[in-house]
């Protein structure tokens, strides 16, 4: 259909109106065309180009995906609560549940929440810009995640599911081992998720480099802003490698290529190199935004500026660079040359240096400060303790000779859940409890939030600490049965999982009460007593010059009518 609004000519039918709006109304009412304008609600939430609304959508999506991923994890722990078959007789189904749990939590819970949710909501505020650099690109970045999630759900529920683990290693992901369409759907879902992340990363980088207000130099940017830009660079550099690897798996499965088929001259180890060249930066993509949040929260909760701001920035940069140089520590058992293993051991141990700088800087920020144990501060301190434990088990696994024994045991599961399930997730909750009054303009029950922290803290520790002992006894991961000797620690671990689910349910009740009974909050709800909460001097000295606290709660759709200036 051709509509020429200049000549008022629609498919040969002439109208006598002069203005564009009247023209469109007549076109809508003409018998051969039905076009319904979106309602205000649809336009705000489906067609949004506002960073705050898109950030809210990301957080809602992450909450839904997190509940799905938690449900899968409980199924795993219920099956492992005793030796023999408990609930899941089919090992392929068990492996499909493990794959679904990992992918839901990594790609659809942590990344959308930490990068998409907090990144979109806060970044324009932190740089003093009106919005993101590419608002409509921002919208498609979010809406690509919805079909991506649907593809993963379909892949888990049709035929035998994708029982490959999140790593998708061939030949297990090849056409002979997984003959149905499940793995293909999972690969398409990963492609969509990757495109979404790359578009978002380009948007974040452009926003930070081009939309800062005068006076907000890069060396004055809040640490969360630095965390987002470093994460975005990691995404841009690593995701294309994953896309290439899984596309080769796709063509091996469907077009008879032999990239990873030994019979045709391919090499499955090549896929492991490609996957982990993405996979190791990916774990830093998950945790670096958490570093930014924890720095902000500890500064606010201590009443001090962050100790060693520049050191924190360059530590994050170092972690990002080194993250690309250590991928083969996931592959010590594939037959690497001894010199290669020596290099990857040394490089992996070096990553502990910038990580240690960050941990000691957080402790130094707390030292001598007036600590306020608000819910976000509790989660931040919990993060520091648990992330340190996870880092120490990582130092053990970095050694090639030890990892040959620990590879694919529950020691590895315990290690990465301490840095993710208690690192990234505790950072997420810390950021949620710090900024959700700003986002919604409503207060929540602080006592209930502290109870949530303690239930979750006990639950996750009871779940994952015993897994270190199972790993030391060499219990293999991704296997649904085990000898009776492992029964005790597995039962404890499963009880901890149920406690974590109770904590998650309790968290949902806190959100419900906040939305139904929450009172309106001031610009800076964390200042006690709230006598001078609108005074700029107080806001800046109390919270490390973060601009978002100068705005109303919730901020207006376009926060800055004129550019803020920072001297």
Curated annotation (Swiss-Prot):
EC numbers, comma separated: 7.1.1.9
Keyword Kinase among UniProt keywords: no
Entry GO CC: mitochondrial inner membrane; respiratory chain complex IV
Residues binding Cu cation: 280, 329-330
Annotated binding of Fe(II)-heme a, by residue: 101, 417
Main location: mitochondrion
Residues making up the signal peptide according to the UniProt record: none
Residues annotated to bind Mg(2+): 407-408
Cofactor note: Binds 2 heme A groups non-covalently per subunit. Binds a copper B center.
Membrane-protein topology: Multi-pass membrane protein
Localization of this protein: Mitochondrion inner membrane
Binding residue positions for O2: 284
Catalytic reaction annotation: 4 Fe(II)-[cytochrome c] + O2 + 8 H(+)(in) = 4 Fe(III)-[cytochrome c] + 2 H2O + 4 H(+)(out)
Cofactor(s), names only, from the UniProt record: heme; Cu cation
Pfam families, per database record: COX1
GO molecular function terms noted in the UniProt entry: cytochrome-c oxidase activity; heme binding; metal ion binding
Cross-link (1'-histidyl-3'-tyrosine (His-Tyr)): 280-284
Residue positions binding heme a3: 415
The family this protein is said to belong to: Belongs to the heme-copper respiratory oxidase family.
PANTHER family per the UniProt record, alphabetical: CYTOCHROME C OXIDASE SUBUNIT 1
Protein's name in the database: Cytochrome c oxidase subunit 1
UniProt gene name: cox1
